[in-house]
Regions:
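Catalytic Zn2+-binding segment of zinc metalloproteases
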Residues: 33, 38-41, 171-180
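Small-residue-rich helix-loop
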Residues: 186-194
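Short glycine/serine- and small hydrophobic-enriched flexible loop segments
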Residues: 35, 103, 174, 193-201
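A glycine/threonine-rich phosphate-anchoring loop and its flanking beta-alpha core
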Residues: 31-125
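Short alpha-helical scaffolding segments that buttress acidic/His motifs in well-ordered protein cores
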Residues: 101-105, 137-148, 192, 217, ...
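N-terminal small/polar loop signature for handling phosphorylated ligands or for N-terminal nucleophile
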Residues: 1-44
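Oxyanion-binding "anion nests"
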Residues: 123-178
Length: 250
């Protein structure tokens, strides 16, 4: 209400423009406000975190959290322009880099085996902010995401593959009351392992795929993200939070 009232008090109209400068939350809120203000005004997204540049700024999803779950209130609304400048990333901590890297790895797993092979060799360079590797990874991630978005804008089927890792991830975040102790990216990294293990049990993927993913985690000191959620008790504690996930169809 505060943001909407601010626009109204300044006499914004449908020919005006909202500019978002910040991370994923900033972009989500700005996009959602732009989508409902006078039934929609234009907005530009300038993401300043790696996570936002490779994921939330691309695809037109906007959303806010509620006490019942993550991103349960939102809309599909495309920005007129997205500007990703890698110089913003120079100030990010390793924890923030891991956040964005999780989505980069996810994109490689769901779509591009050659990109995955490249990440097996270059993940360390990305986390160390080497500009050449970082720029390539951002561009490649955006191309993969837009491949799915352009074919299923409103997430009726194909686009749902972009949620790989996120069912368990959102449950982990809710269970931990969205604590800063575990970031979205860390939760996604955990979720991808749990969901790959489940896929192996259901004979959807092979043990070799799981081991290759785990090897990337091990080599880049990311195994901590899933180890504390790998026992039966921890997984059982997540089940109640899976039931209200917005991706459920039954």
């Amino acid at each position: 209400n505060r943001y909407l009232n601010n626009l109204l008090s300044k006499n914004f109209n449908r020919s005006d423009l909202v500019i978002s400068l910040g991370g994923g939350i900033t972009g989500d809120v700005a996009g959602f406000v732009a989508s409902i203000f006078k039934r929609g005004i234009n907005f530009i997204n300038i993401p300043t975190t790696l996570l936002a540049q490779v994921d939330s700024a691309v695809g037109g999803k906007t959303g806010i959290n509620s006490i019942h779950g993550k991103n349960l209130i939102g809309s599909f609304y495309q920005p007129k322009l997205v500007i990703s400048d890698t110089t913003f990333i120079n100030s990010l901590s390793r924890k923030e880099m891991v956040c964005g890297y999780a989505e980069i790895l996810k994109h490689s797993i769901i779509k591009d085996k050659n990109f995955f092979k490249w990440l097996e060799k270059n993940s360390k360079a990305i986390l160390e902010k080497k500009n050449s590797e970082l720029t390539y990874a951002i561009k490649k991630s955006c191309l993969i995401k837009t491949h799915f978005v352009n074919r299923d804008v409103n997430e009726k089927g194909l686009r749902m593959i972009l949620n790989f890792g996120h069912t368990f991830a959102h449950a982990i975040e809710i269970k931990n009351n969205f604590s800063k102790k575990i970031t979205h990216g860390e939760a996604v990294l955990s979720g991808m392992i749990l969901e790959t293990k489940l896929s192996e049990l259901k004979k959807i993927c092979t043990r070799n795929i799981l081991e290759r993913i785990k090897k990337i985690y091990l080599e880049n000191h990311l195994s901590y993200t899933y180890k504390k959620f790998s026992n039966k008790n921890s997984i059982s504690n997540l089940l109640p939070f899976l039931k209200n996930d917005k991706k459920n169809n039954d």
